[in-house]
Design a protein with these regions (language model features):
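Hydrophobic h-region of N-terminal signal peptides that target proteins for export
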Residues: 5-16
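Solvent-exposed, acidic/flexible segments
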Residues: 102, 113, 117-128, 228, ...
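Hydrophobic alpha-helical segments
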Residues: 251, 336, 380-489
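Glycine- and hydrophobic-rich flexible loops that cap the catalytic core of alpha/beta enzyme folds
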Residues: 246-257, 263-267, 272-415
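Acidic, low-complexity N-terminal propeptides/linkers enriched in Ser/Thr/Asp/Gly that mediate export
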Residues: 120-226, 231-232, 378, 390-394, ...
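Substrate-recognition/specificity elements adjacent to catalytic centers across diverse enzyme folds
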Residues: 19-236, 244-246, 251-259, 264, ...
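Proteins synthesized as precursors that undergo proteolytic processing into mature forms
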Residues: 357-383, 390-391, 463-515
Length: 736
């Protein structure tokens, strides 16, 4: 960090300093010494470039900088991860906390911390020290729950995905079992994706896009990587973290974690996408009560059900109260519900110390071999990974935790827990999964779809693998789109890959609109819909199936698509089809046309006319730093051209109207986006939704909104020579 020293020596940067305490405690003195080993440089976008003498120092600075930008999100992630949300939010979160506590036990995590290797323990110590020093130097910040961070807590949130495996457990069914509330069994709260699937409502797609291009397909013969996570907005921060011990990672870090989750260093880059791998299993346990104890059948024996007590504190108007639960486990895992007289146990990957090791060590990988070595830890359970490196290697890793199972069972459904043949037998190695290294196509991708099209003709073959390696049974619209923009091209560059990532084609409508047009054409002239829909049909007939801020057909198609799939969803579910496919193949002409009439009426009612440009509907707005954002049609907002990814848009913007609004506001989709070129030196461009800071008064709260909305990625300042002309502040933790 010679650049920083020169700038300070020349007096070009002013560093605000906090007055030292007169009588610091020993802990405060220790933290101040540690802080002096850390330098934080904020660039002209407010992005922190953190440097520490050791990796532990760098971790200290990284989490300190995150706390500066949005302590609320940092704390909330760990409140949730440790099952303490009810302490902040009250009684309504009791069963969410119980779900977490079934898997996350403080005593177990403390023991794992104590037995961790010294290098990992040092990182966890630096993590806790950085957050505690932030709180000590910012007494105006009042934590909701966690007033003091302990090193073991880092193990409670050791993998950076937006939706962890634990969240697959349905809350209502958990409450029905443990809360003695049988009515909850049939209730749908809308808090779990499973609830919406059961109602036949298409979910807003979550996940991500990852693309790697081999040198043979690029203009400058350098590997390229697209990093395009689709998450809720402001879920991750953009950072760079470096040390004198070889750490030098740039990318997106989930608030509160000390590793770059999706990003790159000078040698390699990695991108995770949500996977269709079957990594979680449910077991139907045959349980009998003998006396006052429960036993479950396993093979020819009856084993005792393990019983323990979990206590969940919760906030009330007069202080904390608590609710205790007797919880049950078999060797398969905790009991999470009852089904047809059987208890259901769930088994999933739960190895926090190993997961934290993998999450961190991959950020220091220097080539494919060392990256693959970290992947053999098999703890990134819910994700696929796209990889590229400076040597020109590109790779696809399908899932990262696939238990080896007996293929005769249907593992997408609960299996008989009494049958010993349903046991796991280790996990599949990387080479036993649908894995790709340097495919002859010269490209590979994943958009949360199956791996059977990951590299065009070079893709893995479905018949070579057991069914449980992938649960998807059809190609996704984004998958079709990705193949279209990646195939048969040898002229990729950073700019060309960015353009592909924002290509405006909507493949779903290219399939859905023609049956609608045919239905209209078959209408007799006397039908009232013939005249009512004539102009709308003309717009859709002339449309090129591409989104754009000025596009009226985009507005009409999206409103119609939502309406027609909503109408056919119950029947589609009954016959085992997606609503989109049902609308294409089986919807009646009347259903299609009535949905278009309803969509037109909705547009007219909300916006004054059905002929409304997409820019007047689809908006990005950031008014406050609240985790659950408020929206207001009277407030400032930015038009966004790209749509929800459910229609096949690679660039994703999950938007809808909110109470009191007519306009649609986005809350998920494209978040951190980067394109990286691995040449003799790294070159990258990136953008973050809104801005780096979570504070509404910061100049970096919403300074990237226009770039975000238009896909105008900015240059990344990876090297000190780049950062030199774009530095806003340089300081040690505690000095501002």
């Amino acid at each position: 960090m010679k650049t920083i020293a020169l700038l300070l020596a020349a007096g070009l940067l002013s560093v605000p300093r906090q007055l030292p305490l007169r009588n610091p405690t020993p802990e405060r003195s220790r933290l101040e010494r540690e802080a002096r080993n850390v330098t934080i440089t904020r660039d002209s976008w407010g992005i922190p470039h953190v440097h520490g003498k050791t990796d532990a120092d760098a971790v200290f600075g990284l989490v300190y900088a995150q706390a500066e930008d949005d302590f609320n999100r940092v704390e909330t992630n760990f409140i949730n991860a440790m099952g303490r949300l009810a302490e902040a939010e009250g009684e309504r979160e009791i069963y969410r906390d119980l779900r977490m506590k079934l898997f996350i036990d403080p005593d177990t995590l403390k023991a794992q911390y104590a037995s961790s290797p010294e290098w990992l323990k040092a990182l966890m110590n630096g993590w806790a020290d950085g957050l505690n020093y932030y709180l000590q130097t910012h007494p105006d910040v009042k934590p909701r729950v966690i007033g003091h961070f302990e090193p073991w807590m880092a193990l409670s949130f050791s993998e950076g995905s937006i939706g962890g495996d634990i969240e697959r457990v349905n809350l209502d069914r958990l409450e029905a079992f443990y809360g003695n509330h049988p009515e909850a069994e049939g209730r749908t709260s809308g808090t779990d994706e499973e609830d919406e699937r059961e109602m036949g409502i298409p979910n807003e797609p979550t996940g991500s896009n990852g693309v790697a291009i081999a040198p043979a397909n690029t203009v400058d013969h350098h590997a390229l990587l697209l990093i395009n996570p689709h998450t809720s907005f402001f879920f991750r921060a953009e950072v760079q973290v470096t040390s004198d011990e070889g750490l030098d990672a740039y990318g997106a870090v989930t608030w509160g974690q000390f590793f770059v989750y999706q990003g790159f260093n000078e040698h390699v880059g990695w991108m995770h996408t949500s996977s269709g791998v079957d990594a979680i299993d449910e077991y139907l346990e045959t349980v009998e009560k003998h006396g006052d104890k429960y036993f479950y059948k396993y093979g020819n024996e009856w084993r005792p059900v393990t019983v323990s007590t979990i206590t969940v504190p919760y906030k009330t108007g007069t202080g904390l109260l608590s609710k205790s639960f007797a919880v049950y486990r078999t060797h398969h895992g905790p009991i999470i519900r009852e089904q047809n007289g059987k208890w259901v146990a769930v088994r999933l990957m739960n190895s926090p110390e190993k997961a934290l090791t993998q999450s961190y060590t991959r950020t220091k990988a220097r080539d494919y071999k060392s990256f693959k070595q970290s992947m053999e830890l098999h703890t990134n359970s819910s994700n696929n990974t796209i990889f590229a490196d400076k040597d020109g290697d590109i790779a696809y890793f399908h899932g990262n935790f696939i238990p080896r199972r007996n293929p005769k069972f249907d593992w997408t459904k609960p299996v008989d827990g009494s049958d010993t043949a349903t046991e796991w037998h280790g996990v599949l190695s990387v080479d036993e999964t649908p894995h790709l290294l340097n495919p002859t196509s010269g490209w590979l991708y994943n958009s949360n779809n199956w791996p059977w099209s990951a590299a065009g003709a070079s893709s893995p073959k479905r018949g070579d693998y057991p069914a449980y390696v992938e649960t998807g049974n059809e190609e996704s619209w984004r998958g079709y789109h990705a193949i279209r923009v990646l195939s048969n091209r040898k002229n990729f560059s950073i700019a060309a890959l960015r353009a592909a990532a924002y290509d405006s084609y909507l493949p779903a409508f290219e399939k859905m609109i023609p049956p609608l047009l045919a239905s209209y054409d078959q209408l007799p002239a006397s039908d009232p819909l013939k005249a009512k829909l004539a102009d709308q049909i003309a717009q859709l007939r002339a449309w090129d199936y591409r989104w754009g801020v000025a596009s009226v057909p985009t507005s009409l198609a999206v409103f119609w698509g939502e309406e027609v799939t909503r109408r056919v969803a119950p029947e589609a579910r009954r016959v085992g089809m997606s609503p989109d496919q049902y609308a294409i193949e089986r919807a009646t002409p009347q259903q299609r046309l009535d949905a278009l009439a309803a969509a037109s009426d909705k547009l007219a009612a909300d916006f004054g006319a059905w002929k409304t440009a997409w820019r007047d509907i689809n908006r990005f707005q950031r008014l406050t730093g609240d985790i659950v954002q408020p929206f207001n049609d009277a407030g400032p907002s930015t038009p966004v051209g790209f749509t929800s990814s459910r229609w096949g848009s690679l660039a994703s913007f999950g938007a809808r109207p909110y109470p009191g609004t007519k306009k649609w506001y986005g809350t998920s989709g494209n978040s951190f986006v980067a394109v990286v070129e691995f040449g003799d030196s790294i070159r990258a461009i990136a953008v973050t939704a809104g801005g780096e800071s979570g504070h509404a008064g910061s100049p970096h709260f919403n300074d990237e909104a226009q770039r975000y909305a238009t896909g105008n990625l900015r240059e990344v300042y990876f090297y000190p020579s780049q950062l030199k002309a774009h530095t806003e502040k340089v300081y040690h933790p505690g000095e501002r």
